[in-house]
């Protein structure tokens, strides 16, 4: 069965695993999910990620494994994740009108012609694009 919105599926898996205090979350692999995981690691929301071959476990293809990050008293590093641009309603932002998440405390992931960037990186490069998600 095909998945309508794989990015929303990824964000939901990470949100649910974080709320349940799981140490890692496994999901089907794609290039855009890998780029989102890179951004989450650069911004300090996850401790790491890697791609595993699913054929050894009896599956097909590759899986993306994300290692979640918690504070010293098991406080979550991800307070919330929200999908913004959806297949039924795309949301775009110009370089001059990039969104700020929680007044700059959170991160917006934006798909630009230069690849996936955070709102701060897109602002420095002067590019706009599709607003994929907010993380705070």
Curated annotation (Swiss-Prot):
It comes from the Bacteria. SUPFAM superfamilies: Ribosomal protein S8 (SSF56047). InterPro entries: Ribosomal_uS8, Ribosomal_uS8_sf. GO terms for molecular function: rRNA binding; structural constituent of ribosome. GO terms for biological process: translation. Pfam families: Ribosomal_S8 (PF00410). Keywords: Ribonucleoprotein, Ribosomal protein, RNA-binding, rRNA-binding. One of its GO terms (cellular component) is ribosome. PANTHER family: 40S RIBOSOMAL PROTEIN S15A (PTHR11758). Part of the 30S ribosomal subunit. Contacts proteins S5 and S12. Belongs to the universal ribosomal protein uS8 family. One of the primary rRNA binding proteins, it binds directly to 16S rRNA central domain where it helps coordinate assembly of the platform of the 30S subunit. This is Small ribosomal subunit protein uS8. The gene is rpsH.
């Amino acid at each position: 069965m095909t998945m309508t919105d794989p990015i929303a599926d990824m964000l939901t898996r990470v949100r649910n695993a974080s709320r349940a205090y799981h140490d890692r979350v496994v999901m089907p692999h794609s290039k855009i999910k890998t780029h989102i995981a890179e951004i989450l690691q650069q911004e300090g929301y996850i401790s790491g990620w890697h791609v595993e071959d699913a054929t050894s476990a009896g599956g097909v293809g590759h899986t993306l494994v994300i290692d979640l990050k918690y504070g010293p008293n098991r406080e979550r590093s991800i307070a919330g994740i929200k999908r913004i641009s959806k297949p039924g309603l795309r949301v775009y932002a110009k370089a001059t009108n990039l969104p700020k998440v929680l007044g700059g405390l959170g991160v917006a992931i934006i798909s630009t012609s230069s690849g996936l960037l955070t709102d701060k990186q897109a602002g420095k490069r002067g590019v706009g694009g599709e607003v994929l998600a907010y993380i705070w």
